[in-house]
């Protein structure tokens, strides 16, 4: 299409159609692309898009249903991968892995069922899947999104030490608890937690008889909370090990980030592929709600709409449980003009909008609510001059609108 005036989109309420399609999108990038949909250039490309959406629509009632395609945006991750020596967050690797696995499942699916999805398979065949991305992530991160003990020998040693020292902390605390219980230094509650540390609940009169650090006291002052001295020594060792573990995890994640950095363009390609799948999915889902089909696209100068419905009116009437009347409209090389007459609010503007909107939809790769025997050609331009600029659901006549 050579040009499309913004008034045409407004007159035909094309954005209202897009708003309905957006509701079927699963991804933010997909929804953005749907909102920006405009007519496709070239008849061949239009037909290919219509066939693709038609295939996706057919999958909803098939035993070979297309796998899920949802994903979380990687835009922030792409930004960080473009910065030298940057470090991705642990959750970022889970998102990357999900995008890769989702892409792989779709690629394998379309290879297996190529005979059912010719157009979708052609697109899928162009995706170059790099299995080493997932393999690299799986060597470091487990299925729960945490760094594996086996990610490095150093990390395994540190985590074993952490478990050992943690056990020693518990043992030393229990030993102190029993000791001071025998001396009757403990209050009835015996112990509690202060600042994430187990402490002894010592009667205030015995506070100076207990070795350790005072971390607080009760509101009445009758109980003093003390961390036993031996527990403190092990806790200090534990804190040092936690620090060393965090540093080793950071080193591993930095190495993994650097390993994945060259694959940024591949990840962007996967994301683009999944976004396109989301657009086709939304188009197909919308087509189901309006009984949209792919009409005959002809090279001849013909516009032959049979049993054509205005999609917005159809949706509105469905909510109100009203019947929608279809229309038959034909224009060709010999019958280039139709004169429509009738009373106020008699449906003349609706007919104009039906023809214009369905043509705009078909050239944007959307299936339309018409009889399958309908024929449409492709136009270079779509021009409109419709007096009623109100939403079609308002049922305001052109005459009434201009009186306002």
Locate predicted features.
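Alpha-helical coupling/stalk and coiled-coil linker elements that connect catalytic or binding modules
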Residues: 1-65, 81-91, 95-97, 104, ...
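Terminal transmembrane helical anchor/hairpin motif
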Residues: 128-129, 134
């Amino acid at each position: 299409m050579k040009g499309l005036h913004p008034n045409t989109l407004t007159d035909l309420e094309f954005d209202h159609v897009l708003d309905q399609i957006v509701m079927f999108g699963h991804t933010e990038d997909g929804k953005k692309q749907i909102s920006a949909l405009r007519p496709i250039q070239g008849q061949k490309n239009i037909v290919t898009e219509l066939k693709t959406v038609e295939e996706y629509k057919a999958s909803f009632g098939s035993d070979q249903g297309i796998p899920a395609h949802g994903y979380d945006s990687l835009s922030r991750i792409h930004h960080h991968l473009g910065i030298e020596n940057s470090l991705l967050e642990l959750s970022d690797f889970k998102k990357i892995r999900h995008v890769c696995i989702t892409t792989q499942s779709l690629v394998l699916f379309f290879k297996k069922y190529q005979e059912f999805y010719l157009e979708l398979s052609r697109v899928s065949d162009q995706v170059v899947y790099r299995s080493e991305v997932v393999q690299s992530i799986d060597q470091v991160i487990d299925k729960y999104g945490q760094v594996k003990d086996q990610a490095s020998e150093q990390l395994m040693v540190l985590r074993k030490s952490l478990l050992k020292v943690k056990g020693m902390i518990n043992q030393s605390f229990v030993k102190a608890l029993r000791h001071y219980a025998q001396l009757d230094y403990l209050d009835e509650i015996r112990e509690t937690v202060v600042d994430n540390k187990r402490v002894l609940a010592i009667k205030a009169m015995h506070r100076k008889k207990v070795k350790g650090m005072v971390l607080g006291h009760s509101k009445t002052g009758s109980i003093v909370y003390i961390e036993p001295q031996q527990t403190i020594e092990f806790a200090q060792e534990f804190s040092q090990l936690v620090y060393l573990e965090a540093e080793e995890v950071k080193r591993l994640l930095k190495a993994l980030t650097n390993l994945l950095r060259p694959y940024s363009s591949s990840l962007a390609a996967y994301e683009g592929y999944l976004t396109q799948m989301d657009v086709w999915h939304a188009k197909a889902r919308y087509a189901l709600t309006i009984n949209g089909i792919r009409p005959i696209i002809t090279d001849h100068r013909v516009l032959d709409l049979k049993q054509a419905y205005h999609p917005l009116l159809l949706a509105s009437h469905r909510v109100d449980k009203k019947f929608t009347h279809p229309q038959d409209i034909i224009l060709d090389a010999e019958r280039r003009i139709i004169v429509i007459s009738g009373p106020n609010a008699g449906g003349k503007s609706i007919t104009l909008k039906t023809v214009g909107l369905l043509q705009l939809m078909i050239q944007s790769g959307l299936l339309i609510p018409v009889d399958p025997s309908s024929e449409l050609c492709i136009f270079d331009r779509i021009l409109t001059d419709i007096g009623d600029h109100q939403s079609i659901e308002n049922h305001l006549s052109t005459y009434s609108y201009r009186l306002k």
